[in-house]
UniProtKB/Swiss-Prot annotation:
<feature type="region of interest" description="Disordered">
    <location>
        <begin position="93"/>
        <end position="133"/>
    </location>
</feature>
<feature type="domain" description="Helicase C-terminal">
    <location>
        <begin position="860"/>
        <end position="1012"/>
    </location>
</feature>
<dbReference type="GO" id="GO:0008270">
    <property type="term" value="F:zinc ion binding"/>
</dbReference>
<feature type="zinc finger region" description="RING-type">
    <location>
        <begin position="782"/>
        <end position="826"/>
    </location>
</feature>
<dbReference type="GO" id="GO:0004386">
    <property type="term" value="F:helicase activity"/>
</dbReference>
<feature type="binding site">
    <location>
        <begin position="440"/>
        <end position="447"/>
    </location>
    <ligand>
        <name>ATP</name>
    </ligand>
</feature>
<dbReference type="GO" id="GO:0008094">
    <property type="term" value="F:ATP-dependent activity, acting on DNA"/>
</dbReference>
<dbReference type="InterPro" id="IPR001650">
    <property type="entry name" value="Helicase_C-like"/>
</dbReference>
<dbReference type="GO" id="GO:0016818">
    <property type="term" value="F:hydrolase activity, acting on acid anhydrides, in phosphorus-containing anhydrides"/>
</dbReference>
<dbReference type="Pfam" id="PF08797">
    <property type="entry name" value="HIRAN"/>
</dbReference>
<keyword id="KW-0238">DNA-binding</keyword>
<feature type="compositionally biased region" description="Polar residues">
    <location>
        <begin position="113"/>
        <end position="127"/>
    </location>
</feature>
<protein>
    <recommendedName>
        <fullName>DNA repair protein RAD5</fullName>
        <ecNumber>3.6.4.-</ecNumber>
    </recommendedName>
</protein>
<feature type="compositionally biased region" description="Basic and acidic residues">
    <location>
        <begin position="1"/>
        <end position="12"/>
    </location>
</feature>
<dbReference type="Pfam" id="PF00271">
    <property type="entry name" value="Helicase_C"/>
</dbReference>
<dbReference type="GO" id="GO:0006281">
    <property type="term" value="P:DNA repair"/>
</dbReference>
<keyword id="KW-0227">DNA damage</keyword>
Amino acid sequence: MEPRQKKARFFDSEEDFGPDTKSLIRPGSSHKPGKPASNSLARPTPAPSTFRSDLEAFLGPLSDQRFGLLLAKSKGNVEQAVNIHFDLPEEVQQATSEETAEEAEVSQTTTSGFETTQKPSQNTQVPSRVHTRGGCSTSRFIGSLVVTAWASKSSKGKVKYQDRLVVERQSHDHSKSIRKNPTDNSHVHIRTVSGELLGRISGEHDYSIASLIDSRVCDFEASCVYADHNLSLGSNFVVELKCYLTEEAFQDVAMPLLDSKTAKKREYVFDNSRESHVEKMLRNRQIAIVDLFGKLNLIKENEANADMVKDMLRAKSQPPSSQPPSQNSEDESEPIPTDELDALYKRIEKEDVEQPETEVEGFPLELRRYQKQGLTWMISRETEVSEYFDNDDSGPINPLWTKVDFPGSDEKFYVNFSSGALTLKFPKQERSFSGGILADEMGLGKTISTLAMVYRDRHVGCTLVVAPMSLLWQWEQECERVGLSTYVYHEKGADIDLDELFKTYSPNILITSYHTLVSHYGQIKALGGGLDRNVISETSSHERPKIFTKHFHRIVLDEAHVIKNRNTVSAKACCLLRATNKWALTGTPIHNRLEDLFSILKFLGAAPWNDFIYWRNFITLPFQEGKIVSALMTVQCILEPIVLRRTKNMKQADGSPLVVLPKKTINIEKVALTDQERVIYSYVLARAQTSLQKSEASEAVGRNYLNILTQILRLRQSCCDPALILRPEAEVPTDEQLQIEENESQLKSMIQQYNDDTQTSACEYSSEIIAQLQDQSAPPECPICAEDVTKLAISKCLHMGCVDCLADNVRFQESKKQTPVCCICRQPAALKDIFEVERTGEDCKDIRLKKLSDRPRSSKLVALVSKLKQLPKDAKSVVFSQFTSYLDIIQTELRREKIQAFRFDGTLSRQQRTDVLKAFGLSKGSVLLISLKTGGVGLNLVTANHAFIMDPWWTFAQEAQAIDRIHRMGQTKDVHVTRFIVENSVEEKMLKIQQQKMVLAGTLGMSEQEQKAQRIENIKTLLGE
């Protein structure tokens, strides 16, 4: 048989289009045998409304069957479609003759590219059916699509027009595959009703359809629109999909994603991993619903949020393989520009000028006016909360939800395109939780305000207070002051059975720590199948920690920013707690990242913002895309109704200050390094500069970033005390968890020489001078202070005086960059050459010369001791440092100077912390040594009015938090703060960075690449000359 002669083409084409599979593969595509061809076209696809009209302008009216064939062959290209029409007249006529009356139903659809949206007649009943997967339930028809499928094998006469087909996903546990492989298998197979595999849906549609099937949102019925009689591998055929919403689609958005056995046994509580399999499936569901509803044209133009949904359609997320979510929680969102964060806090501040005042009858403490107004607001936040969903649709609809009509019916349902949730009930705009965030600035009495609220309804139920371990004693003490009964559920106190406790003793307030919750949460691993599941086994409820099963009247998280990282066990544990009312107390609900707020909202149950899908779509993603103002405005809208924030600088209605506090003075004390200290500092600086230069030369600054930060850490330590450089620091600041290399013999030698420089023994002094000291019946007069010597010392030049006078003379000259000399004979002098004279034995005739110091005092330590000695004898001081090893050195020196010092840091137990704070409060003229990290959390230290900051933090906000532990409500004296800064050092440059509101760990409000570049510039600034 001779081959058919092709007719002259209506259009010229670079290709011949025949029935072979080559004609269906885009030129230049990376198609391989057994692989589906790409669905994208070599030429732009005409607009959906013009393709059919343009085609019929050349060929005349076309039936849907003929149009389907040309659409599949030409892939939407008019020129190719016309040429195919004339090249294959026999096939076209055969396809036309096979058209049946049932085509009328298909012809009622309107074509949109490769998709059609069915519009059933208003007089016809909406298609519905019963599906059996997952149990019997009714599915509701919402529209139909025409999609292109790819033949996965060759076949002959297996499928023809209007044959019913089966849509099938691979039978495997999708939740497990998500956990194992971040790239999901999104293939959707098409089979005949007899089960024979024909192919799979093309890549343009398979991801969304697969997600909808996996999440049990939709069922699909398929039928053939067009297929070649002889299907070859890689060829296309056209399928119509009828879409049905399942009953499960309207259930809790989280529960259907668990397998049926797990769903019956487990209670979904808190999903707080970086992105768990549940969060991933929810995100996939949301993307697929947005995609499907867009294709079905179910979004009306007059809906209030139609523009938002269309934006989501235009920029809908890519499949996870192309845009995987961040696996680092800290990078989930970029840092907030400092100016924007300050402005956000300013906008949510409440003046309360119109807020009425609430008195608490019998409350023993006097509340200030702003506290009474705040109490009114807090009480209003604990009023009864109505159900989030209500059948009464007379009120305003929640702005995040959109009303959608079932096709051909007066019935409707509601969809939240930001989360993928569906409901048949009217979503009213209602308050979703009871409680809020009390975010008053530090020192305005958040604790007293909370206790007043508890006291008001103390007989209603128990309030659980969760606080850092260092504040447990403070809460217990404050409760006792106002007459509230307490029980401290911590350490040994946490071993008690809560049910038994409340049978015999019902405290007004149960006080526990975040540490205790973390400890109890660890028990869930054995009971609930693992912490990564974020679920608790109901079958083991009798063994579950009782603090997670008891329903409290109220829960208060003090210093709630402790749970700012949603991946921490502290955050997860707090979100398991159950209560009618929930409160978060924190002066900084947002520290420097928007993600800081998410965990607090999750704890509060602030729907819908406690759902990570909402948070990601409305806040995280816009912020990462540079829409900073828009994202922060959304955060402002979230916070305004649930946050009460006042600051010390605010005014009351009559213009008077909100709170009157004593004056606070902050001074910067410049400290000069000694020559030996400068040598060590210069050596460390040179090493850091060399490291930076080598990294720049090899373009590896980013890879060596931590190593360079290590060098900067050494510089900071050498400013405090050179001995710190080689000490393993147990409590290095959180942004500097860096290891210090110790195999540098030259640096070790320099520091050893600094510590042990030229030991002088008493035997160098002549026996004549010792004898002269033994014969003295009374102490000599000091040549420096001209008073009787109470603590005798002798120098190498054999001149005597007060030990402090001789030592201070040397230190003063060193601070002025002068060579120290004796004030009497002008011979060279040094601290190592001064010995304290100790008399022992009968008549104090036995003389012992004691070296002034076992090691030299650093310049900062000298400056601190000098300042402390200048204070009145009964003055109390607090000394802050980031380095606990430095606090060890300071403590040793203060003891040597007979200055009473107490130590407060993270190494102390709760009882030890309580004892330290009590002793410091009762003492006079004492010093409290405290780590900056511990001192920045909740402590009330108003018994002291002098503060010394030994080393600067990267941001002054951290130092300000520590200072406000002294300068707060209850302080009656002026507060004096001294910040010690070494001249011509990295510390001075850190002050400049503070003033520019920049942070080394990441410059704010820039793209990732800009942040990296700015970090490098900051390093250059710190290490520059």
